[in-house]
Amino acid sequence: MVANSSYLDFTSYGTIPASVTDPATAYGLTNTQPVTGNAHITVAVVLNRANDPTALLNADWGTRQATLAQMQANGTLWTTYGADTGTFNTVKTQLGGIGTVLGDETGTGGYVTSAASRTIWVSLDAAGFQTLFGTPLMKGAAFGGAYEQLYWNGDLSLPASIASSTAGLWFDYGMDPATSALTSSTVALPQGAQSPGNQSTSATELYPQDIAALYNFPLSGPAHQTGTLALIEIGIGDALNPTIPGPSFQSRLQAYLATAGVPGSGAYYVQNSANERYNADNADERSLDVGVVSAIVPNSLIGLYVGSGDTVYTAYQTAIWDQQNNPAVISSSWSDGLSFAPGSPFATAYRELFVDAALRGISVFNDAFDGGSGNETGTGLTNLFTGSMSSYAMVVGGTSVSTLAAAQTDSTLAGVVLAAQQGDLATLWQMVRGGLTAWPVGAGQLEPFIETVWNQYVLSGSRLFPGYGENFATSGGVDTTQATPGYQTAFGLTPTDADPSHGVGRGAPDVSALSQGNMGYLLPGSNMLGVYPNGGTSAATPFWAALATEFNAIFKDQGLPNLGYSNDLYYIAAAIAPASFNDITAGNNVSTFIPGSTYTSPQLGGISATGLGYAAGQGYDLTTGLGSPNGLLLARALSSIAHAELYYDLTPVLENAGAPSSGASAGWSSTADQSLLFQSSLSHAGEWSLSLGSATYSFAGNAASPYAWTSALAQQSLQSDFSPTLVTLFDGYGQGQIVQTGVAAGTPLALSVSGTPATSHQAALTADYGFVDFVSGDGLSSVEVARPLAVATTANGANDADAVVRLRQNGVNDVSVMFYKVADYAGTVDGLAPGQAGYAEAAAAHAYSTISGQTTVSGSGYGAYSQTELAHVNAGDLIAMKLTSNGETYWAFASGNETVNGQHVAHLWSYGLNTWGWEDLYGGGDHDYNDLIVQLDFTSASGSHLLV
């Protein structure tokens, strides 16, 4: 027997009681009997890999990409990770004697059969099914005889000669899960909107490229050549309504682009067009996808993948294995809605598809879906389409974006609008973290005011409209059928579902973007005629895929490989460059229900709500993931990380030789003789302590102001269009305590807050980039350990490179900064340590010049932004700074600065990836450490300067 291979393991894991094992009972089938005659069912037999690629795919991105490129070049990639060729041929011959083998390595007919894909598709009649699986193929009348449903009883078996080589099975048979109530606990819903920020009476409607501009996408599509992008368009392709005559699909696409004001050819192709048929619902999805990507990356070749027309699986497979067009990015807004069991051959087959995509160097973006936490599935518990939740794909959730004009006509945002207009700091602080770059703004300006979770459900009396059975809220939650991916664990996450079982697994979504609500996309209609507002995570997903296509174009320009499987890079970016994402903190996706009589909902009839789901909050959450993109800042972060991983063996600021996997403070040690900053950010005044070797130092720490600058704000401020008003609005709010000292290589290090050891859950992501955060048990206080200097990770490991310098002044003094090369992490120059006689002269002799020949860079005035470039930077240079403020000199190393109460004063605060803030007043001033924000960027000036 093949374990976990029952029909309900294929379709209905977790959606019916475990005690229900009979498919006919689960689905309410009648007139059940064995299949006779000419009925066929098609199945993929997925063979074992010759070798397990898990270790390679768990390696860092740089190692992964370099290894895959080498294996591809020497022809060993698929002999290593495909099926054994001899085994493949033997099993194929055996299956050909039982049924009809379909497809080939090119995907003929919508089926890929090849040793590399490890897949053999075979069409079976009833006798062939019995021969291969040892059980009859059954049929029954479903929904009162509306259609005939195929199924089987019990587990499947395979001939021993095939079973030993088989890892997975997949039936090309579209089916929804059987469902029944799995809880009886219900709740009363509040009247009105179920989530804020989706009820404007003057919603904004924009073309996709204009929405991309709101998210600060790095490229202007028409000006750049971008790569091939695949859209999963099961069964529809470029089919048009045959009853409505008109121009070709190509002509209609070009007409849409012309209407949108986008120059571009609208080039596309269809894979397996013989399997496409016009269906209005499928066509609407297709036209949405095509409209989004063609308007944003109009120079990309767009592939429409039809597959067999029966399951999304086949469309994925043909896109992944298209070795002629080789799409670098796949976007899917489709899901095979069934719920397969973990450990089943069906789960293995589906999940290995995305492993193939990762090995092929393809980035996959899947939608979270549009059914809220319940996913339009009436079990009363939270649900996801587990087939789309692969840890090798980026799962995309949905938001609603409100301009000020839209917010002013949304009753759920009245309090936010009023607070912002009254200058409430807490409100503006949170909105800035959500992406606000200018304030105040005019009511007519197309600036995002606030972004919230997409959830348009409204209760009026006992009627939900829109309701839980309609596509009006982002799905999101936890796929407990698989383990938490390493990149989420490294980010400090333990995704836990809202069900009474509180299962742990893969959190979804990873990221989010506009779906609908208070803003919509202007897109072609289902028949590619006219322009209409549309949206959903079905729009947010190709939106992200278009952004990734821009990233690939930038990577190519900089000499990097395509992103490929790169989920880990996005999580690293969020940890070291948090301004890469807009943090959505308002809204929820609650939509769980069971059949009942409390409320009525379109598509569902009578329901009762069970109230399980997820709310947005600070940082990662299960409605919006890491957040929505700041495209340019994310591109810069990804570029920096990619070059660092490909070309450098970085020395982490600390290493952990023996700490538990929880990230506990014990076991950490210094990796070098180095000067380190210890920055406390306490939620309330209290003690924190630092242990270095056998010595422990305790500090009576002051609480940081609620508006003390964060890494996110510091990095956000380094955008040329970030409002000086917002910069100066948050001036003068003090940080906590800072201590700077030299630490010898190998010195053990531990930190405690209020007597309790602090833990570092993101050290694996940040230590290579010069800092580690140690967080208190309640998560409200932290101490960051950071270096006060930059390591020049230049693009491609090149010497004599230019480095971008970005400055934002938030102090009133005249300030300038000098950048100079030091010999080591302790800051020595020519054998002199900071503070020693002659150090200033030695530092000046090693100063970098700007491209205009200056050895200092001046601030541009209170609140102002400025930018320049350093010349002649070599790979691996260690770069430190000296600040001059009103005639006083301050060094990045406290030992070179003035002494107050017997202690040298630290004037520098770390704000993440190569970003620091200076305190420009003698003695430490107001301790806000934002008088001059400085960032060094070693990769954006490479190639064609696309990110400068």
Positions of predicted regions on the chain:
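Substrate-binding/charge-relay-adjacent region of secreted/lumenal peptidase catalytic domains
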Residues: V2-T113, W121, A126-V395, E451, ...
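Secreted peptidase-domain scaffold signal
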Residues: D210, P524-M528, G606, G611-A615, ...
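Polar, glycine-rich mid-to-C-terminal structural blocks
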Residues: S391-N471
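C-terminal, well-structured subdomains that either form a transmembrane helix-short loop-helix hairpin
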Residues: P533-F543
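Short glycine/serine- and small hydrophobic-enriched flexible loop segments
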Residues: A545-A553
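An often Trp-containing, charged/polar helix-loop segment at the C-terminal end
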Residues: N552-Q618, L622
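Short beta-strand-to-coil "C-cap" segments at the C-terminal boundary of structured domains/repeats
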Residues: R636-I641, Q935-S942
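Extracellular distal adhesion/interaction modules in secreted or cell-surface proteins
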Residues: L646-N930, D937-L947
